[in-house]
UniProtKB/Swiss-Prot annotation:
One of its GO terms (biological process) is photosynthesis. Seems to be required for the assembly of the photosystem I complex. Belongs to the Ycf4 family. Its main location: plastid. PANTHER family: PHOTOSYSTEM I ASSEMBLY PROTEIN YCF4, PTHR33288. The keyword Transmembrane helix applies. The chain crosses the membrane at residues 22-42, 57-77. It is a multi-pass membrane protein. This is Photosystem I assembly protein Ycf4. GO terms for cellular component: chloroplast thylakoid membrane; photosystem I. InterPro entries: PSI_Ycf4_assembly. Keywords: Chloroplast, Membrane, Photosynthesis, Plastid, Thylakoid, Transmembrane, Transmembrane helix. The keyword Transport does not apply. The lineage of its organism: Eukaryota, Viridiplantae, Streptophyta, Embryophyta, Tracheophyta.
Amino acid sequence: MSCRSENLWLELIAGSRKTSNFLWALILFLGSFAFLLVGTSSYLGRNWISLFPSQQILFFPQGVVMSFYGIAGLFISSYLWCTISWNVGSGYDRFDRKEGIVCIFRWGFPGRNRRIFLRFLMKDIQSIRIEAREGFYARRILYMEIRGQGAIPLTRTAENWTPREIEQKAAELAYFLRVPMEVF
């Protein structure tokens, strides 16, 4: 989502609170909990899940392995839920022609560097660059070349932009910033 005026462009960046992340975290939690439950029921000799009689699953080695996978899955699931609750990767890109400043803000993981805030002068922007890689795993990323800083990605690598969409966004941004556009 973006908001534009004559001198200001504000681009809101979605973080990890996406439907797919919620679904994967839920599926992983339920599956790993079921694995842990089957492993525990094979150890105790009780039938906690009606689909798998505990007498058919021996604790060693099947129950141990299922318990291990259940615990590992719960750790990964908790990591995903924390990432979703912290909304890692969300933020905004703000381009202000009136003040001549570009601000890039992202939320990170908790700690000393939770808030990632970059500020540049517009006169230091050399170009807007599109990096396109075609093939089996095609990816198109939009970069902003900053003098003395290198390239800063403006789009996420997981976003699947069509060539037309990424080119249009790059052209609009380059026109707004009054810088050249490069394609690699």
